[in-house]
Swiss-Prot record:
Species this chain originates from: Salmonella paratyphi C (strain RKS4594)
Catalyzed reactions: an S-(2-hydroxyacyl)glutathione + H2O = a 2-hydroxy carboxylate + glutathione + H(+)
Hydrolase among keywords: yes
Name of the protein: Hydroxyacylglutathione hydrolase
Residues that, per the record, bind Zn(2+) 1: H53, H55, H110, D127
């Protein structure tokens, strides 16, 4: 399997997974034009679309792509049914695409019906997890989002996290505002800054490394707990997550 990314809008990535024959699955096509261009250039043969949630920048290109490739199966949670999904999927479902098995996990938080798709090592997590951060809580609760992130955190170390947005630099700046002396975060900041100066993408990322720099995956970390305790004593990791998310919302 080969992983490809297509830039879209200002900071979106549309992921395309292809096999050796050129058959492919397209993840969260927010717009059709760049996808159609890439398909023509690479002579890909689209078989399916994966949708993680209903937001327009993830589903806006579905109907046009179906006009060009009506044979495609469009998988998505119930909230995407009116966005072009032809096969509804949910927590615990498994589907076989390109000869590979993908497992679905419900990840409410960013939206209530959000899901991610996992076929080792590939994780297509939509707007649940970003490198150095996580999605805003437009519909769900902090508790829901925390539990969703813990599902990701329980995956194998070598999981390849395919986030949907290039938010890494801003997220790491936030992390440094909380833990300015953290060696892992500082090293990652230098690396990410250099990549972005060159206009190179910072994704995908490996989960083992992400655990070191993403505060939202480090709510049990003693340094972070000590920093939060300077402002308020929070005993539960979910409460510490909510504190972090609130700080990020106003950063």
């Amino acid at each position: 399997m080969n992983l490809n990314s297509i830039p879209a809008f200002q900071d979106n990535y549309i992921w395309v997974l292809t096999n050796d024959e050129g058959r492919c699955v397209i993840v969260d096509p927010g717009e059709a034009a760049p996808v159609l261009k890439a398909i023509a250039e690479h002579k890909w043969m689209p078989e399916a679309i994966f949708l993680t949630h209903h937001h327009h920048d993830h589903v806006g290109g579905v109907k046009e792509l179906l006009q060009h490739f009506p044979q495609m199966t469009v998988y998505g949670p119930a909230e995407t049914q009116d966005k072009g999904a032809t096969h509804l999927v949910g927590d615990g479902d498994t589907i076989r695409v390109l000869g590979e098995k993908f497992t679905l996990f419900a990840t409410p938080g960013h939206t209530l019906g959000h899901v991610f798709y996992f076929s080792h090592p590939y994780l297509f997590c939509g707007d649940t997890l970003f490198s150095g951060g996580c999605g805003r809580l437009f519909e769900g609760t902090p508790s829901q989002m925390y539990q969703s992130l813990m599902k990701i955190n329980s995956l194998p170390d070598d999981t390849l996290i395919c986030c949907a947005h290039e938010y890494t630099l801003a997220n790491i700046k936030f992390a440094l505002s909380i833990l300015p002396h953290d060696s892992f975060i500082n090293e990652y900041y230098r690396k990410v800054k250099e990549l972005r100066v060159k206009k190179q993408m910072t994704l995908p990322v490996i989960l083992k490394n992400e655990r070191k720099i993403n505060l939202f995956l480090r709510t049990e970390n003693i340094d972070l707990i000590n920093e939060i305790n300077k402002e308020t004593i929070l005993q539960q990791p979910e409460a510490r997550f909510a504190w972090l998310r609130s700080k990020k919302d106003t950063f």
